[in-house]
């Protein structure tokens, strides 16, 4: 219900969803919690939180390095502990997880979904799991009332987009371009055709990700028919550039979010 409530409220005010991505435990768990609290205070619509992984193939260099920073002290137990703390801090904001398949399967699929439900998580996106393998997780997601998110890519066939639209719950992660994550000066591709196709198959909101780093990108995304954006690399870059000064980091994050939300 948290995603539904969020999108309904945004629609009433004719606003776009702005969802930041950060890696849990980057640069450490204490700062990570402060970063997430700053994001919430700054007025983000929802959270997309990553589990650090040694081989994050869908990510560009900025987020790869954030995984490496977090991996110095990361553990599944600490990730779950931080998720619980975030949920206790704010009972209303939707919390999405972005994880790589290996982490989920090595933990045990059903156990993982049961655990994140207990932590107050709302959705999961598995970065490197193709749609064809959805049956491996979908039963556990439904059983534990976790919304499973799937990715709509620019080169997907109409049939694949129909599958993505039909099976995604909460929202659909729509790629602004193919390749890996990373901030861009301009949005290279027009995703309006993909978004239009998705909306023909399902009313599930479509969020645009990959390359979102400026306010004008959000305006462009709105023009393409997107219901919101996911922003990761530009935000993670601020963390990377302020590792020696927590206060400066939090202030810059606040300023960045303030400049992006409208």
Curated annotation (Swiss-Prot):
Extract the PROSITE patterns matched here.
Answer: TRP_SYNTHASE_ALPHA
What the entry lists under InterPro entries is as follows:
Aldolase_TIM (IPR013785), RibuloseP-bd_barrel (IPR011060), Trp_synthase_alpha_AS (IPR018204), Trp_synthase_suA (IPR002028)
GO terms of molecular function: tryptophan synthase activity
Q: Could you tell me which pathway this protein works in?
A: Amino-acid biosynthesis; L-tryptophan biosynthesis; L-tryptophan from chorismate: step 5/5
**Annotated EC:** 4.2.1.20
Q: Which domain of life is it from?
A: Bacteria
Print the keywords alphabetically.
Amino-acid biosynthesis, Aromatic amino acid biosynthesis, Lyase, Tryptophan biosynthesis
User: Catalytic activity, per the record?
Assistant: (1S,2R)-1-C-(indol-3-yl)glycerol 3-phosphate + L-serine = D-glyceraldehyde 3-phosphate + L-tryptophan + H2O
Q: Which GO terms describe its cellular component?
A: cytosol
Annotated S-S bridges: none
Does the keyword field hold Lyase? yes
Q: Write out the catalytic residues in the record.
A: 48, 59
Asked whether the UniProt record includes Lyase among its keywords, one would answer yes
Please describe what this protein does: The alpha subunit is responsible for the aldol cleavage of indoleglycerol phosphate to indole and glyceraldehyde 3-phosphate.
Quaternary arrangement and interactors, per the entry?
A: Tetramer of two alpha and two beta chains.
Family assignment from sequence similarity: Belongs to the TrpA family.
**Name recorded for this polypeptide:** Tryptophan synthase alpha chain
What is the species listed in this Swiss-Prot or TrEMBL entry? Answer: Helicobacter pylori (strain G27)
